[in-house]
Swiss-Prot record:
Keywords: Cytoplasm, Nucleus, Ribonucleoprotein, RNA-binding, Signal recognition particle. Belongs to the SRP68 family. The keyword Nucleus applies. Heterodimer with SRP72. SRP68-SRP72 heterodimer formation is stabilized by the presence of 7SL RNA. Component of a fungal signal recognition particle (SRP) complex that consists of a 7SL RNA molecule (scR1) and at least six protein subunits: SRP72, SRP68, SRP54, SEC65, SRP21 and SRP14. Residues 559-599 are annotated as: Disordered. The gene is SRP68. Its main location: cytoplasm. This is Signal recognition particle subunit SRP68. GO terms for biological process: SRP-dependent cotranslational protein targeting to membrane; SRP-dependent cotranslational protein targeting to membrane, signal sequence recognition. It comes from Saccharomyces cerevisiae (strain ATCC 204508 / S288c). Present with 6280 molecules/cell in log phase SD medium. It comes from the Eukaryota. GO terms for molecular function: 7S RNA binding; endoplasmic reticulum signal peptide binding; signal recognition particle binding.
């Protein structure tokens, strides 16, 4: 019979879903809500009558007898209640990390939720006290200790933390996880994720532990101490074959030197811890995305240890005797470790990008789903661009023209892959073929210009999963094929766009009675007028006559025809009688318009 694993159901589920940002944990929180609704229904704990709900709440009356006799899902229900509070706490912590600090309201919510999670964890331990499977029971106990440690570290707002309790809980949890991992009852990735999350806290609250042997020995001491002899988790471990031993290290083993040959630089690692962590990290070759955490963890430990070594041992006589230029030697090692950390992060993001690209290829034609996936891939490409920019600024990299050009090409590769593989497809699905063609043309020009700047790609200095000659050629072929596939549609769209409805052109429905309708006129946007249009109208003659009365012209010599007309007009005027009001000395007034504009 396979035992239920609470650790995999919580921390393992987090690792599988790649929860990294606050929005990821918010989505995870929503998923937990749906699971809890389903579990409450299956456990018959739904109270439909909400009047005086506290007296009718079935969840508060759960006890160990219900867990033993009714269903084991009650334990899962309580477990996920605590996990939901932890997910909200992780969301607030990540938001505070981005902002730089917690808001006062967030501090209160964080403390309240972690305190509630502690109460839920205590209830979980109490309800599952008769669990027959020691594997499940041990994980319930370990989960409860992790929740209490989380509350003491981040939830309880005191200047002085309970160092002894925090370090003791974490040590026992680490012992349980290591034992279950050795028995192949827990996946190594899940255990490493938890250890990486809380190892720094263990080092800090246990008295500034530094080396791996020191941490191992502290864990063994906590398990074997008289203080924990009555602890249920310790009893379960000892009864089921726990045999972790202390590690003894000699001073001679700590003076191991390791040579580094990186590009044109040579250096020697003096500190044994740095050499050990670096060797362990570089020996890990991840085949899955979750395994990158192990490699990064080892390399970051090497970085921390080397920075500590520089701060405390720089420019000392014993080191100067072993290395000619110790300061330069230390800086080379520092740059080398940072280079490998960034390169590992880039490889991880590259695998994530490949994973999302495979999901993109399997998507249906639904535009919202493709748009959501595109945004996820765009976020990964931004991370890749940032990591590549950081690695290009490292000492020893920005002065290496060949390596720098290949890193720049790698950055361009991912940007063009996203534009031509995803964004152009989205434009095509919306019928905007000219924009899609513009993306292909721009990608082709940028890639050709970049390749012309690089002398040769015969020797690739980056890992094959990041950049290779085949991948560059494949991208070139994709760009050419994509451009060829859309150029005809773009030309057709351009013609239609060029002959589209003008400002004063009539629509189809306006041409029904008066004008001939051509097949090219029939378009969805040209069937009937959608917006009011301002059309020109002819001016009224009366307005022109009114203006003419007030226009004067320069005197010009009249032509023969004008003289003849004027003579005829004079004769006709002389025949009309002149009123008594007009005198010979008065000038003639121009007639006004309706008697309003006369003078």
């Amino acid at each position: 019979m396979v035992a239920y694993s609470p650790i995999i159901a919580t921390y393992g589920n987090r690792a599988e879903q790649f929860l990294e940002t606050d929005s990821d944990f918010a989505k995870y929180h929503a998923k937990l809500n749906k699971k809890l609704q389903h579990l409450r229904s299956r456990c018959h704990l739904v109270t439909k009558d909400t009047k005086k709900y506290s007296s009718k709440n079935k969840y508060g009356e759960i006890n160990s007898e219900d867990y033993d006799n009714k269903t084991k899902l009650i334990g899962v229900l309580i477990l996920l209640h605590a996990e939901r509070d932890l997910a909200l706490a992780e969301t607030l912590k990540l938001r505070a990390r981005q902002r730089g600090k917690l808001k006062k309201s967030e501090e209160k919510v964080l403390s309240t939720r972690l305190k509630k999670a502690c109460k839920t964890a205590d209830k979980l331990v109490n309800v599952t006290q008769n669990e027959q499977q020691w594997i499940t029971r041990a994980q319930y106990l370990a989960f409860a200790k992790l929740v209490h440690s989380e509350y003491l570290i981040n939830g309880k707002r005191f200047k002085r933390k309970d160092n002894a309790k925090i370090s003791n809980n974490l040590a026992l949890v680490f012992a349980a996880l290591e034992h279950l991992k050795n028995l192949s009852l827990l996946a190594e990735e899940v255990v490493d994720n938890i250890v990486n999350k809380y190892q720094y806290s263990l080092k800090q609250y246990a008295g500034n532990l530094i080396t791996t042997p020191e941490i191992n020995n502290f864990i063994v001491e906590r398990v074997q101490s008289d203080e924990n002899k009555d602890d249920e988790l310790v009893k379960l471990l000892l009864d089921n074959g726990f045999n972790m031993k202390k590690i003894t290290t000699s001073t001679e083993d700590q003076k191991v030197t390791t040579n580094i040959n990186w590009r044109s630089f040579n250096a020697k690692i003096i500190d044994a811890e740095v050499a050990q962590f670096l060797e362990q990290g570089l020996s890990i070759h991840p085949t899955q995305i979750t395994q990158y955490t192990q490699r990064l963890s080892k390399l970051e430990k090497a970085l921390d240890r080397h920075e500590f070594f520089i701060a405390n041992h720089d420019d000392q006589d014993d080191i100067d005797e072993m290395v000619e230029n110790s300061s330069e030697n230390n800086q080379i090692i520092l740059a080398y470790i940072k280079y490998n950390i960034l390169l590992t992060s880039i490889s991880r993001e590259r695998d994530l990008f490949t994973h999302l690209w495979n999901q993109w290829l399997k998507l249906n034609t639904s535009l919202p789903s493709k748009l959501t996936k595109y945004k996820e891939m765009e976020r990964i490409v931004k991370n890749l661009t940032k990591y590549l920019s950081d690695i290009m600024e490292l000492p020893g990299v920005y002065s290496d023209d060949e390596l720098l050009s290949q890193l720049d090409l790698c950055k361009l590769y991912f940007q063009l892959f996203l534009n031509t593989g995803c964004l152009s497809v989205l434009y095509q699905s919306k019928g905007r073929y000219m924009e899609a063609l513009a993306l292909y043309v721009d990608a082709y020009r940028r890639l050709e210009n970049k390749l012309s700047e690089i002398e040769s790609l015969d020797e690739i200095l980056l890992p094959a999963n990041l950049l290779s000659l085949n991948s560059v050629r494949s991208l070139q072929k994709r760009i050419e094929n994509g451009g060829n596939s859309v150029i005809t549609l773009a030309e057709y769209e351009k013609r239609n766009h060029g002959g589209s409805l003008g400002k004063y052109d009539l629509t189809v429905i306006e041409k029904l009675d008066s004008k001939k309708i051509l097949p090219t006129d029939i378009q969805l946007k040209n069937l009937f007028p959608l917006k009011p249009k301002m059309l020109p109208i002819p001016s009224k003659p009366t307005l022109f006559d009114l203006a003419f009365n007030y226009i004067t012209y320069d005197k010009q010599e009249p032509s023969a025809s004008q003289v003849k007309d004027s003579v005829t007009e004079t004769e006709s005027i002389s025949q009309t009688p002149i009123s008594n009001e007009q005198t010979e000395g008065e000038p003639k007034k121009k007639r006004g318009f309706l008697g309003l504009f006369g003078r």
